[in-house]
Amino acid sequence: MFRTLTVVPLLALGLSLSACADLGQPTVRADLLDQTGKVTGTATFSPSPIGTRVSIEVSGLKAGPHGLHIHENPNCNPGPDAQGQTIPFGAAGGHFDPGASHNHDGPHARNDQGHGGDLPMITVGEDGKGRLNFDTNRLKMTGPTGVLGRSIVIHADADDYQTNPAGNSGGRERCGVFQAIN
């Protein structure tokens, strides 16, 4: 009887700790800048029991859905697009693609089927404010699928989740570089 009472709680503790293994990851945040350099929101990625909790708040955008993506480079300066023209936040580079899929896809595709950086759209209200919260197991804060040392970009238009390279989601409206906050 004593062994059963001892083993069962220890087994439950071990299972709960293994489910929280990713909770050792740092929390990272990006201040979202507009094209003038003004901070207009934040994107925070933090550990959650299923992987990563994503929380985004932004203001000053037109009403409606906006494409949202993790980009390769930790740089929000102007830079060249695929055609070599300088665009706002172009130095952020292309979409983060840890699975080397070379394919724009929806936010629920596996990393080997679509860019790991393709996120759900953020919807902005008539007041110009948007908020998005979700959990994902496709991205972490560090490691091969980590966002630390990368950027996040909010685009001008909705993402069609199929057109390469950016889902036909228009220009880059907001950008932020992820930094560890703990």
Curated annotation (Swiss-Prot):
EC number annotated for this UniProt entry: 1.15.1.1
Region (Disordered): 91-118
Compositionally biased residues, Basic and acidic residues: 102-115
Pfam families: Sod_Cu
Residues anchoring lipid (S-diacylglycerol cysteine): 20
GO cellular component, one term: plasma membrane
Membrane topology: Lipid-anchor
Cofactor detail note: Binds 1 copper ion per subunit.
Localization terms from the record: Cell membrane
PROSITE patterns from the UniProt entry: PROKAR_LIPOPROTEIN
Cleavable signal peptide: 1-19
Alphabetical UniProt keywords: Antioxidant, Cell membrane, Copper, Disulfide bond, Lipoprotein, Membrane, Metal-binding, Oxidoreductase, Palmitate, Signal, Zinc
Binding site for Zn(2+): 95, 104, 115, 118
GO molecular function (one): superoxide dismutase activity
Reactions mediated catalytically: 2 superoxide + 2 H(+) = H2O2 + O2
Binding site for Cu cation: 69, 71, 95
EC category: oxidoreductase
Covalent lipid sites (N-palmitoyl cysteine): 20
Job description of the protein: Destroys radicals which are normally produced within the cells and which are toxic to biological systems.
Family: Belongs to the Cu-Zn superoxide dismutase family.
Protein name, per record: Superoxide dismutase [Cu-Zn]
Organism, as annotated: Deinococcus radiodurans (strain ATCC 13939 / DSM 20539 / JCM 16871 / CCUG 27074 / LMG 4051 / NBRC 15346 / NCIMB 9279 / VKM B-1422 / R1)
